[in-house]
Structures are given as C-alpha cells and as structure tokens.
C-alpha cells in the first residue's frame, strides 16, 4: 500500500511540475542589436569613441616627442658634454614616466578614466533598456527574458520569442 501511495505522489508531483512548466513564458533580446540601432546608445558610444580617440592622439604625440628626443640624444651623444648627457637622460626618463602615467591614468584595465567614463555614460542607457525590457515582459506576459548576446549561453531560440525589436521600439518611442 505504501508503495502505491509513493508512486501516486510521484505521478502527481510530475503532473504538477509539468503544468507549472507549461505556464512559463520565456523571451530573449539581443542587446547588441539594441545598442547598435538605438540612437541614444549610438550617441553614447560615439561620445566614448571620441574621448578614446582624443586620449590616444595625446598618447601618440607624447610618444613621438619622446622618440624624437631619444633619436636626437643618440645622434649628439658623442659630442655632448657630460652634464648635458645627464640632463638629457633625466629628461628622457621623465618623458617615459609621463607616458606610462598617462597610459595608466586613461586606459588601465578597470581603473582607467575610459572605463569610469564608460560606466558613467552607459549607466542611464542600461537603466532605460532594463526598464523597456521589463515593460515588454509584462505586456507579453513573460516570466523570463534572456540576453542572447550576453554571458548566458542560449543554444537555441525560436524567433517567435525574440522581443528585441519590441524593446527597441519601446526605447525609440520613449515609453
């Protein structure tokens, strides 16, 4: 008798889980599509790219000035008095240090100004995207929405559940 009750309880549990699973509605978005087609995200990326290009140009100028000074030093090395050699060497060391400091300050992985600026510029963009995703999820009665282009691996996705363009539309309409 206990054996039959156990089997019946397993069957009911299985039926209950199957019923619960059929009520789940899952969708996905491709955040890369949103970031490349939504005007606010495009502008933000353009601003970040402009800043990166500006700092890269400054770094290139500093490096070229250093290389020119090092070449001049090498050419004049044999004719320079000892005190001038020492001063030129100190200048070169200082220039090299300035280049390294600038590179670290602007571009250091995770701590450089470019990463801080990225977070600052894209924080409101991400908030708007998440808000639009939430609205679409509620409108569509979805329980879960995954990002197809994120770290979550999505091995198969039926395009019927793709809500990327609904989210993009919501962002473009500003609602």
Range-by-range predicted roles:
Residues 4-14:
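Sec-dependent N-terminal signal peptides
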Residues 17-18:
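Hydrophobic alpha-helical membrane-insertion segments, chiefly the h-region
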Residues 21-175:
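Amphipathic, charged alpha-helical segments and their helix-to-coil junctions
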């Amino acid at each position: 008798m206990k054996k039959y009750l156990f089997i019946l309880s397993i069957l009911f549990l299985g039926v209950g889980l199957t019923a619960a699973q059929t009520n789940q509605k899952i969708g996905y978005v491709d955040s890369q599509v949103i970031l490349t087609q939504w005007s606010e995200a495009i502008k933000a990326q353009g601003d970040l790219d402009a800043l990166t290009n500006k700092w890269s140009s400054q770094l290139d100028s500093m490096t070229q000035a250093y290389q020119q000074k090092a070449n001049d030093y090498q050419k004049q090395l044999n004719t320079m008095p000892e005190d001038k050699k020492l001063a030129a060497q100190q200048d070169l060391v200082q220039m090299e240090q300035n280049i390294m400091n600038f590179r670290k300050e602007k571009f250091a992985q995770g701590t450089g100004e470019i990463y801080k600026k990225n977070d600052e510029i894209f924080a409101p963009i991400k908030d708007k995207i998440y808000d639009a995703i939430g609205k679409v999820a509620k409108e569509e009665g979805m329980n879960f929405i995954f990002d197809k282009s994120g770290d979550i691996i999505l091995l198969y996705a039926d395009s019927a559940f793709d809500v990327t363009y609904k989210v993009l539309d919501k962002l473009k309409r500003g609602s």
